[in-house]
From Swiss-Prot:
This is Hydroxyacylglutathione hydrolase. Pfam families: HAGH_C (PF16123), Lactamase_B (PF00753). Zn(2+) 1 binds at residues 53, 55, 110, 127. InterPro entries: Clx_II_MBL (IPR035680), Glyoxalase_II_hydrolase (IPR050110), HAGH_C (IPR032282), Hydroxyacylglutathione_Hdrlase (IPR017782), Metallo-B-lactamas (IPR001279), RibonucZ/Hydroxyglut_hydro (IPR036866). Keywords: Hydrolase, Metal-binding, Zinc. One of its GO terms (biological process) is methylglyoxal catabolic process to D-lactate via S-lactoyl-glutathione. Belongs to the metallo-beta-lactamase superfamily. Glyoxalase II family. It comes from Escherichia coli O9:H4 (strain HS). It comes from the Bacteria. Signal peptide: none annotated. Its EC number is 3.1.2.6.
Length: 251
């Protein structure tokens, strides 16, 4: 299996998995044009689309792709049923694509119906988990997003986190504002800064590394707790997550 990233809009990535035969899976195609260009250039045969949630920058290209390739099966949560989904999937179910089983994981927070897809080592997490950050809470609660991130953080160490946006640099600037002396965060920030200066992608990331540099996955970390306690005493990791998310929203 080959993993490919297709840039779209200002900072989106549309992920494509293809096998040796050229069959491919497309994840969150917000725009059809760059996907069609890649299909032509690589002689891919699209088999399926995975949708993580209903926002336009993730579903906007579905109609055109299905018109061009009517054999495509479109998997998605209930909230994407009017966006072209032909196979609604929910937490605990599996999608069998390209000879692989993808587990569906419910991750409410960014939207109420948001889902992720996992088939080792690939995690397609839409707008739930970003490198160094997490999605904004447009529909769900901080508690829901905290629980969703806990699910994803519990996946195997070698999981490849395939996020849908290039937000890594801004996320790491925020992380440095919270933990300015953290060695892992500083090292990763320098690496990301160099990549973005060359207009290179920072994704996917390995989950084991992500746990070290993403403050939203470190709500039980003593260094982070001490920083938060300087401003307010919060006993529960969910409360600390909500504090971080609110802080990031104003960053």
């Amino acid at each position: 299996m080959n993993l490919n990233s297709i840039p779209a809009f200002d900072d989106n990535y549309i992920w494509v998995l293809n096998d040796e035969a050229g069959r491919c899976l497309i994840v969150d195609p917000g725009d059809a044009e760059p996907v069609l260009n890649a299909i032509t250039a690589n002689n891919w045969q699209p088999e399926a689309i995975f949708l993580t949630h209903h926002h336009h920058d993730h579903v906007g290209g579905v109609k055109e792709l299905v018109e061009k390739f009517p054999q495509i099966v479109v998997y998605g949560p209930q909230e994407t049923q009017d966006k072209g989904t032909t196979q609604v999937v929910k937490d605990g179910e599996t999608a069998f694509v390209l000879g692989h089983e993808f587990s569906v994981i419910a991750t409410p927070g960014h939207t109420l119906g948001h889902i992720c897809y996992f088939s080792k080592p690939y995690l397609f997490c839409g707008d739930t988990l970003f490198s160094g950050g997490c999605g904004r809470l447009f529909e769900g609660t901080a508690s829901q997003m905290y629980q969703s991130l806990k699910k994803l953080s519990a996946l195997p160490d070698d999981t490849l986190v395939c996020c849908a946006h290039e937000y890594t640099l801004s996320n790491m600037k925020f992380a440095l504002s919270i933990l300015p002396h953290d060695l892992s965060i500083n090292d990763y920030y320098r690496k990301v800064k160099e990549l973005r200066a060359k207009n290179q992608i920072t994704l996917p990331v390995i989950l084991k590394n992500e746990r070290q540099i993403n403050v939203f996955l470190r709500t039980e970390d003593i260094d982070l707790i001490n920083v938060i306690n300087e401003e307010t005493l919060l006993q529960q990791p969910e409360e600390r997550f909500a504090w971080l998310r609110s802080k990031k929203d104003r960053f």
